[in-house]
């Protein structure tokens, strides 16, 4: 066995790997001790020897002068001259012992002016610790302890924010310098890099769009009670160390160390020992109290080292808890925004997407009502709470923006193509909703996500894709009763923040899956249950991502600026505008737990164009290869009017620009007056609109087919 093998065997025997870092710290400390001792020991011994010899010489000379003064007859008879000679001797003694400056500092004006006190406070939270001035009273030392413990973390956070701002400014200056350099050189390489960055930017925008989400594969990860991803379960089980226990451990260690200091230092009291220990572990080190027992300095150093580790642990736990609290508040606010967005865009899942005009029209109507809401009188403490909530919200949003900027910078150095998106499905998020002949199990929140994602395709100025949606959500929030709790005020300030739109553009929204089931009445409805307890299905199911089911639809009624049709999305003034194609294919399933059958694709029959009263007849339907009995019954019930007089262009409905508002006296009706105060306008304030074409909702024929089926049976 070689020498290296023996050393390696011995290290494994004593388990050196578990505490080698501590040994390295001790070795580094010993190296520093040797280094400083080498250069300071001899010089300090010489300086102390000179000081001792000088002190002995001064003492001997002072004694000789006193003897001369006592023997001198002139000085014996003249008391004033004798006093003056004695004062000169004392001054000479103080100058020789270098005590004049120290006496002058103690006898001058107090250093505890406003500027001096601010200088001392700055020494504490910056951990500089010049040692002048220092506190001498017990009250001042107690204030020093708490001020330093609270000020040091705050100052570190301030330095972090300032460093991030300076780093961003330096980065912008560097980009500008590189840009100017590229413009001056105008080389092909710089042009290629510029085009590459632009293409990458356009690629990211395409990914966030509706078409990009269709093209990217989406892998569905299943979650259920007691069954989830192992990494997520491990992350959930990792609980941080309790902060109260850490603080109790720190307090116990401070008391124990202070007691040991009182034993080793006879002149110290317990309060002074606590003050010295806390000032030491906070790395301030004012130097107003020193050890008088050099033999115990090593043990004192070990006590301070353990206390410093405990204090650092407490600071880290508190910082992590604050960061998690900020992240939790941000996630809850984003979730509320998504829920409110779902309420804004709630509609029938079988009806086509609303055009961008509906998104831009509705917020203005709601803003008119919101501006007439009377302001609530709030007191000083309520206003202070609003101000505090606003500051906390600004800090949360600013931190998220900085994190997103860092992530965007790091993404440029990673691979160019991103990994597939991962969507999560939970059992509690799925609901069942029916519409006529079809039944679908869909995720309720997926509509809000899909509608928010569709805003990127709306005809709104770039950089303000969420502006109209936020205006509508703000109007909804204003009508809610105001609460005085901090969370409600923070959410209100969250909506009012000007950077919220940018946050929504940069936040990766959670995508949930939609499971579509087509009911086939030709056979029995079979309900199967998975042996492992998964969800039952009806008919033939195919799992697909919510984002992947979105199809571009530019066919809508000609009344594009109608308030009723596009604000509420529930009235249709034209025949149903589904894509006029024979059939289309849903893409292949992505290994979802809901895809139980062996079919790779599912054929969806053609959507029929159903005539409405006052509308021209739709084009004749094409022959269907896959027609269910329900579709056949619907075709038999449809009777198209061939009268050429009604084959006219649909009459254009009144829009917001055609309405003339006028104020109508309401009399003494308090309800109408309150309604006008809240809404701004009432139906009585408008002229009677011209008669338009009658409207009706589409009857899917489901009840009729069920009645006919029961009759035939």
UniProtKB/Swiss-Prot annotation:
Cytoplasmic side: 1-15, 163-242, 319-713
Gene for this chain: twk-12
GO cellular component, one term: plasma membrane
Transmembrane segments: 16-36, 142-162, 243-263, 298-318
Membrane association type: Multi-pass membrane protein
Upper taxonomic lineage: Eukaryota, Metazoa, Ecdysozoa, Nematoda, Chromadorea
UniProt entry tagged with the keyword Membrane: yes
Source species of the chain: Caenorhabditis elegans
Protein name: TWiK family of potassium channels protein 12
GO molecular function: outward rectifier potassium channel activity; potassium ion leak channel activity
